Swiss-Prot record:
Family recorded in the similarity comment: Belongs to the UPF0122 family.
NCBIfam families listed in its UniProt record: PRK00118.2-2, YlxM
Source species of the chain: Clostridium perfringens (strain SM101 / Type A)
Protein name as catalogued: UPF0122 protein CPR_1686
Family annotation (InterPro entries): RNA_pol_sigma_r3/r4-like, UPF0122, UPF0122_fam_protein, WH-like_DNA-bd_sf
Membrane-spanning residues: none
Length: 112
């Protein structure tokens, strides 16, 4: 299977676009680390059906991301935040409370 972390992030971004069953299966597999057999048993279906659903949903999530580009936007925001924090940390004259406040506000912007 693909990069688990990447798919997990795509589930976070686009999970609401999946059906309830698709979302549940993807969450069980990628976030809860259940095996195909365990998920098949829970859903009263075959291991192959779960495998096919996961592959299909992975492609679907990648397709959403190619169109909406949320992961690239979030990555860019984190890079900008890190650059800003590095510049702030170079300036030792700034109060630590101010640095912490700026860091928190940047985090809010990223997660908005």
């Amino acid at each position: 299977m693909e990069n688990r972390f990447e798919i997990s992030m795509l589930i976070d971004y686009y999970g609401t676009l999946l059906t309830e069953k698709q979302f549940n299966v993807m969450t069980l597999y990628y976030n809860e680390d259940l095996s195909l057999a365990e998920i098949a048993e829970i859903n009263k279906t075959s291991r192959q059906a779960i495998y096919d659903l996961i592959k299909r949903c992975s492609k679907q999530l990648h397709s959403y991301d190619e169109k909406l580009k949320l992961s690239k936007k979030v990555d860019k925001r984190y890079r900008i935040k890190e650059e800003l924090m590095a510049e702030l940390n170079k300036n030792s004259n700034l109060d630590e409370d101010i640095k912490k406040y700026i860091d928190e506000k940047l985090e809010e912007i990223i997660n908005a």
